[in-house]
């Protein structure tokens, strides 16, 4: 994380940003804070690479923390007024209290029932002298928080400003306030009088004093408050300290891999220590050896927890070791934002289950990361105990949120699954186990099976080996009514299902007290069937069948091939069929599908409860469908611009191939050989033009397979492989297989030999197009062939189009055709977003289809804003290829030059005069500073010198240098500071360091150093500066002695480094005689070198104790930051293995109090050169 924080105050919220924010980031943070402050929903599109993740995290967490900084409600410190006189028995004059001056809360309606007031404890009398002491109250609140239960969400708050109240309401409020202050004063009094007495003991004492208290009468106004523990919907909850209770932030994204990317971004921020957790499935977090290797991990996990086979999960019993935030954050490596893999490693080490640990951490977490189907699916919310009321929901990568919402409210079950559930319920009934609850559930399965069998005989043929029959939601309600499942009986069925899932049952023996016994329950697979059915039935019956019209119910029959069951002859011998083909049978599979066609059904559970919903992605366009489809009013919408310049991207449409044939990727044209050959020739031409990695996206796997077969037949595939390594995305398969294939692609680009990079042919909506990062050389061009419309013959697509057409006027939905096209644009934008992943990236976007040229108003309007603004239409492929060649050649030349300079720096590094550190840790070649202090009392001078080979007769022009006074070696904080920096250095091309220059290091056997060693024996290029100490410089004689920067303390004494310029260094045979250049006085320091937005003030010393540099918070400074885009730098946008020098420009380098003061040689060289020219 960058240590140079920029502070922005937006909407009254102070946001600590890890760098200078881009205008797109400022716009996003402004929209998010506005939405959170006003409880409005946000729809935000920001292109990939514009720092969207950092803006989301920083703005949301800053707003959340700002709530806890608000002052305590004045009502807590105000003495409650005496309530009006009451004639009830509990307030009569003859009513006496115990001699401990305890006042019984009016919330007690039985002698033994604890108070339902704040913290559930009784209160002292009003005459207690400590009741008005604020310090006592605060101390008591802190003490009470230790023993507080989990029911604080239902405590009634007091507002600073209240509307007019009736007399009865005033009396109720005073009674409540009285109770609240009694709690605080009592705890404070006990802490002062008896500090050694635990709270639990005092509570038991108070409980004993309640035994003689009669219940409240019905006339008492306090009793009217007794059953009113619910808060109004528009109130803000308070925590136990009287401050606003901070809403949790549920941060949902599409995949677990994207969660890992988000947590890495969180580590870069000032909010990296926020309490957090990550929810995941057992596939990602289970560590039990018997479960990990099992196909159905959930079922195996439940068996272990139930102890069915005499075994239990010892990992589950160790959850308490790390189940709270305080314990977790004090463990090694978990104090900052962590990833699920780190939790899994820690759980395996401590024998604690990571899956259940993550669930336990929800309670105290401020931010919860999870796949967003965890928030949309009601079953998963119930399983994970996710409560969204009053919380903040952020859904990143939400371009697929509509499909996910529909799937969350849909359910499919096969006839085989229903029969298995029926048989299992039968066995439990026959065993006389909870017979009354199991019988109604078994009847549901029986009725559905009979209905399936009856209607499967009247299915309509649809396509090859498939048939179906469809009912509307209202028609299905009539069928359910005939089965006995109605609005009145369904709640009873729900109670029966809850009962059969209870593992224990309380029984009372004849002679003995009540005890719990273990009861067998239904298997996990049967639970899934019944819970899924009850979920869709709940939607169908909810609110007088409000959502019934949003469903379609279908019986689908498909066929699958299976091996024939073994047949034995009369003698009992296995009869083997003569023809092996006859050993396989075709079996029909009937499935009952409840399809939700309206994503607003699933979103209704969220929209009615949460405080704010934030939908964001790089490819939300077009935005107009989200509000109508999700049933959510997005009052705040944003389409942010990209952070790159126009010269960094080439966007063009191509309507014809190299031979001039039109390319229209409709179904009719893609079947022709002419189209297939023309696309292949176009792809080959682009591969010969653009180097490194190229991605090609096709509309479907079916077309990919057709093209592959055709190109192999014609020899075009071989031609492609002669230029690049060609990889095709597989359909389905294991995740590990796909990851291995992807690694082959990366390696072909990184370690290219005879071939120039790699070509990856993928499919829109596939694995490659979703969430993968192809930055820099991994994707210098993205080619999309056609427009990826959904399969028009798909039954669900057809039903959805009909549904939208039917409700377009009544509900404001988009017509079916517009909805259909929008699905294609989103998939296309997602594929195009694989290229240009950060500010300094460059690449080409090639859209192959003549429909873009022929009807741009229709087909271009659906693309992302930053693509629409730069798209160019090319009338012929030749003109497009010419323009693409010039673009690629220009940028590739700059990239190659940067890489060459970087390689020169790395190759010459061992010949530099460097002071080796006492520690043998590997250091970064490109970022290490090369200092040789003479002794602990002298200051090192930074000298920029020119390297030359001894064989070169002429010297290059001298470059002016300047000295910078440094801190002394004896500073105790420098050694740890340097070591910490070396561990966190990026872009490491490591080299071993020697304790002295006089010693030769052992050769390194790494492949990269073999090439470096070969280069050391050749001519050394004059491109890398060195840092040389000044032996005779007196203290304070530095040219710039007013500005002191910290110096690492791991340097050798001067007597060990004398005359090292003539000694061998890393076995190099080249001796370089340094040429000292006189320093030229200069006072105009570059802020890019010293990472300050302003020039350093005189006599300013940057030391480990110095606070982190921050951007000015004034309005003028803020305007300057917005206007100056050239200096914006976001760590999120740079891959850890990339270097800033590749882009040919000097980027802000972060300096921190805990990092080394090392400057890269390139920075010093460029800075000194600039000074010399002025």
From Swiss-Prot:
Listed CDD domains: SF2_C_XPD
Segments carrying motif DEAH box: 393-396
Entry's localization field: Nucleus; Cytoplasm
Region (Interaction with BRCA1): 888-1063
Binding positions for ATP per the UniProt entry: 185-192
Modification sites for Phosphoserine: 929, 932, 994
Enzyme Commission identifier(s): 5.6.2.3
Ranges of compositional bias, category Polar residues: 101-126, 923-935, 990-1001
Co-factor binding comment: Binds 1 [4Fe-4S] cluster.
Comp. bias intervals (Low complexity): 134-143
Primary residence: nucleus
Pfam families: DEAD_2, Helicase_C_2
Limits of the Helicase ATP-binding domain: 11-445
Reaction catalysed by this enzyme: Couples ATP hydrolysis with the unwinding of duplex DNA at the replication fork by translocating in the 5'-3' direction. This creates two antiparallel DNA single strands (ssDNA). The leading ssDNA polymer is the template for DNA polymerase III holoenzyme which synthesizes a continuous strand; ATP + H2O = ADP + phosphate + H(+)
Modifications after synthesis and translation: Phosphorylated. Phosphorylation is necessary for interaction with BRCA1, and is cell-cycle regulated.
Subunit annotation: Binds directly to the BRCT domains of BRCA1. Interacts with the CIA complex components CIAO1, CIAO2B and MMS19.
Function as written in the Swiss-Prot or TrEMBL entry: DNA-dependent helicase and 5' to 3' DNA helicase required for the maintenance of chromosomal stability. Acts late in the Fanconi anemia pathway, after FANCD2 ubiquitination. Involved in the repair of DNA double-strand breaks by homologous recombination in a manner that depends on its association with BRCA1.
Designated name of the protein: Fanconi anemia group J protein homolog
Organism expressing this protein natively: Mus musculus
């Amino acid at each position: 994380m960058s240590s140079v924080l920029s502070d922005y105050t937006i909407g009254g919220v102070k946001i600590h940003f890890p760098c200078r924010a881009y205008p797109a980031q400022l716009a996003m943070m402004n929209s998010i804070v506005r939405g959170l402050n006003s409880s409005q929903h946000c729809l935000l599109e920001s292109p990939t690479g514009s720092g969207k993740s950092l803006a989301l995290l920083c703005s949301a967490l800053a707003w959340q923390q700002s709530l806890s900084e608000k002052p305590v409600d004045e009502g807590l410190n105000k003495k409650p007024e005496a309530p009006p006189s009451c004639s009830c028995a509990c307030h009569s004059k003859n009513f006496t209290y115990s001699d401990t001056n305890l006042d019984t809360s009016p919330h007690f309606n039985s002698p033994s029932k604890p108070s339902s007031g704040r913290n559930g404890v009784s209160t002292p009398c009003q005459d207690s002298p400590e009741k008005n002491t604020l310090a006592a109250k605060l101390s008591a609140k802190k003490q009470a928080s230790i023993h507080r239960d989990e029911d604080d969400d239902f405590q009634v708050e007091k507002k600073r400003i209240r509307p007019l109240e009736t007399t009865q309401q005033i009396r109720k409020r005073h009674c409540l306030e009285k109770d609240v202050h009694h709690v605080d004063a009592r705890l404070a009094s006990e802490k002062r009088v008896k500090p050694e007495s635990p709270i639990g003991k005092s509570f038991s004492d108070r409980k004993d004093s309640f035994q003689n208290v009669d219940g409240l009468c019905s006339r008492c106004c306090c009793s009217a408050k007794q059953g009113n523990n619910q808060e109004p919907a528009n109130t803000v909850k308070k925590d136990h300290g009287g401050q606003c209770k901070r809403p949790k932030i549920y941060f949902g994204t599409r995949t677990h891999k994207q969660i890992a990317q988000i947590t890495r971004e969180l580590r870069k921020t000032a909010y990296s220590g926020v309490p957090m957790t990550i929810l995941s499935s057992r596939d990602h977090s289970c560590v039990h050896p018997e479960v990990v290797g099992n196909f159905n991990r959930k079922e195996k996990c439940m068996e272990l927890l139930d102890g069915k086979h005499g075994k239990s999960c010892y990992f589950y019993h160790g959850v308490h070791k790390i189940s709270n935030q305080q314990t977790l954050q004090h463990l090694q490596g978990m104090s900052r934002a962590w990833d699920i893999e780190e939790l899994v490693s820690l759980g395996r080490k401590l024998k604690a289950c990571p899956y259940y640990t993550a669930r336990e951490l929800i309670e105290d977490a401020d931010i919860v990361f999870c796949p967003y189907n965890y928030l949309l699916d009601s079953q998963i919310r119930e399983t994970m105990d996710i409560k969204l009321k009053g919380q903040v929901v952020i859904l990143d990568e939400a371009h697929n949120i509509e499909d996910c919402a529909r799937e969350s409210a849909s359910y499919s079950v096969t006839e085989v699954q229903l029969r298995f559930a029926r048989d299992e319920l039968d066995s439990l009934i026959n065993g006389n186990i909870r017979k009354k609850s199991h019988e109604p559930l078994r009847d549901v399965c029986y009725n559905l099976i009979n209905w399936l069998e009856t209607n499967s005989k009247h299915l309509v043929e649809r396509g090859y080996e498939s048939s179906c029959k469809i009912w509307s939601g209202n028609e299905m309600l009539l069928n359910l009514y005939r089965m006995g499942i109605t609005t009145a009986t369904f709640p009873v069925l729900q109670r029966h299902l809850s009962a059969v899932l209870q593992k224990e049952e309380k029984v009372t023996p004849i002679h003995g007290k009540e005890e719990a016994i273990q009861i067998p329950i239904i298997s996990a697979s049967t639970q899934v069937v019944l819970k899924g059915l009850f979920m869709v039935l709940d939607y169908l019956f909810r609110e007088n069948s409000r959502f019934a019209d949003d469903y379609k119910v279908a019986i689908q029959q498909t066929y699958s091939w299976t091996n024939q069951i073994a047949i034995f002859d009369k003698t009992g011998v296995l009869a083997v069929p003569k023809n092996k083909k006859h050993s396989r049978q075709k079996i029909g599979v009937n499935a009952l599908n409840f399809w939700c066609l309206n994503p607003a059904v699933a979103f209704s559970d969220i929209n009615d409860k949460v405080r704010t919903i934030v939908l964001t992605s790089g490819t939300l366009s077009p935005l107009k469908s989200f509000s109508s489809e999700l049933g959510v009013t997005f009052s705040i919408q944003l389409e942010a611009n990209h952070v790159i310049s126009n010269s960094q991207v080439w966007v063009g449409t191509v309507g014809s191939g190299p031979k001039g044939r039109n390319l229209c990727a409709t179904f009719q044209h893609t079947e022709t050989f002419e189209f297939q050959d023309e696309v292949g020739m176009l792809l080959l031409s682009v591969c010969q033009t653009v180097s490194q990695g190229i991605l090609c996206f096709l509309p479907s796997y079916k077309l990919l397979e057709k093209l592959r077969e055709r190109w192999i037949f014609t020899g075009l595939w071989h031609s492609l492989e002669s230029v690049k390594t060609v990889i095709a995305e597989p359909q389905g398969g294991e995740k590990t297989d796909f990851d291995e294939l992807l690694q082959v692609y990366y390696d072909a680009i990184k370690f290219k030999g005879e071939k120039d990079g790699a070509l990856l042919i993928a499919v829109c909506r596939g694995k490659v197009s979703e969430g993968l990062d192809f930055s820099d050389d991994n994707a210098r061009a993205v080619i999309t062939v056609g427009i990826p419309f959904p399969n028009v013959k798909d039954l669900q697509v057809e039903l959805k189009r009909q549904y939208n057409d039917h409700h377009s006027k009544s509900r404001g939905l988009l017509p079916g055709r517009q909805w259909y096209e929008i699905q294609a644009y989103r998939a296309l934008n997602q594929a195009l977003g694989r290229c240009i992943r950060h500010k300094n990236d460059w690449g080409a976007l090639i859209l192959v289809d003549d429909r873009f040229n022929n009807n741009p108003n229709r087909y271009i309007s659906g693309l992302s804003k930053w693509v629409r603004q730069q798209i160019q239409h090319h009338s012929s492929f030749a003109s497009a290829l010419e323009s693409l060649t010039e673009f690629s050649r220009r940028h590739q030349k700059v990239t190659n030059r940067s890489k060459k300079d970087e390689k020169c720096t790395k190759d010459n590094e061992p010949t530099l005069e460097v002071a080796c550190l006492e520690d043998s840790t590997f250091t970064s070649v490109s970022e290490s500073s090369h200092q040789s202090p003479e002794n602990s009392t002298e200051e090192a001078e930074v000298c920029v010198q020119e390297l030359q080979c001894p064989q070169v007769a002429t010297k290059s022009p001298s470059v002016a240098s300047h000295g910078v006074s440094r801190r002394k070696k004896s500073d105790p904080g420098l050694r740890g500071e340097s070591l910490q920096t070396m561990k966190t250095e990026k872009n490491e091309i490591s080299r071993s360091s020697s304790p002295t220059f006089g010693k030769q290091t052992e050769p390194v056997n790494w492949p990269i150093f073999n090439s470096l060693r070969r280069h050391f024996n050749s001519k050394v290029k004059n491109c890398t500066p060195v840092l040389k100490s000044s032996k005779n410089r007196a203290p304070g004689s530095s040219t710039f002695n007013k500005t002191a920067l910290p110096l690492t303390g791991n340097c050798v004494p001067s007597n060990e480094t004398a005359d090292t310029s003539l000694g061998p260094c890393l076995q190099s045979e080249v001796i370089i005689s340094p040429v000292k250049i006189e320093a030229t006085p200069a006072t105009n320091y570059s802020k890019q070198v010293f990472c300050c937005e302003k020039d350093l003030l005189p006599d300013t010393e940057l030391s480990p104790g110095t606070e982190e540099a921050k951007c000015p918070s004034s309005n003028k400074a803020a305007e300057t930051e917005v206007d100056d885009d050239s200096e914006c730098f976001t760590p999120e946008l740079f891959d850890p293995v990339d270097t800033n020098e590749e882009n040919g420009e000097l980027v802000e380098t972060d300096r921190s109090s805990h990092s080394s003061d090392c400057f890269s040689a390139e920075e010093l060289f460029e800075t000194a050169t600039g000074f010399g020219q002025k």
